[in-house]
Amino acid sequence: HIKGKYLKSLASGDKLGAFSLSEPQSGSDASNMQTTAQKKGDHYLISGIKNWVTNGINSDYVILFAVTEKGVGHKGISCFIVEKGWDGFEMGKPENKLGIRASDTCELYFDTVKVPDENLIGKEGEGFKIALETLNGGRIGIAAQALGIAQASLNASVSYSKERIQFGKPISTYQATQFKIADIAMEI
């Protein structure tokens, strides 16, 4: 059901998704997660706050992690799809980030949001495993972003050193500047 309802529109680019694991009090430490999903008949009632959610404002759907069973640590975490616009689901203002500004990042607020059973991804208690599998796949992309940012910084440093004139010459001609740029290049 979930694949048919959500994946096709995400894969085609018609819809945008977000991943919400981190929380204000615990960061990405899932064992201290405060967001809860309480089973009530054919749905769950989800309450809590998520932060640092990339695409949180512009997303149509959010993958949400919440505690369905307290006292068992990460084994009590489950994963859900929550749709934008459902009662009790609010987006915070965008964070003013220093980088990766092509996507928004914000807090998300869930105040007794009614989520149907069929929006549970996997089974109850499998959320932590799903989160780790997703994060592992994303680490390559994050590393590529970091490498790209570092390379762009090196390129900007070289460019600036050729343009900046000090004592009648570009600072790129001074050995101290060359050493600093070489150090940056070696770190990359």
Task: Annotate the PLM regions.
Residues 1-8, 12-13, 54-61, 73, ...:
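Internal helix-loop-helix
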Residues 5-6, 33, 49-51, 92-96:
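Short beta-alpha junctions and helix-cap segments that line functional grooves
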Residues 89-188:
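Glycine-rich beta->alpha junctions and the first turn(s) of the following alpha-helix
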Residues 29-47:
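Cytochrome P450 C-terminal beta-domain/meander region
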Residues 25-28, 52-55, 69-71, 97-104:
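Short Gly/Pro-enriched turn/cap motifs at secondary-structure boundaries
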Residues 1-23, 39-42:
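FAD-binding glycine-rich core of flavoenzymes that anchor FAD
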Residues 19, 37, 46-48, 64, ...:
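Buried hydrophobic positions in well-ordered alpha/beta secondary-structure cores of metabolic enzymes
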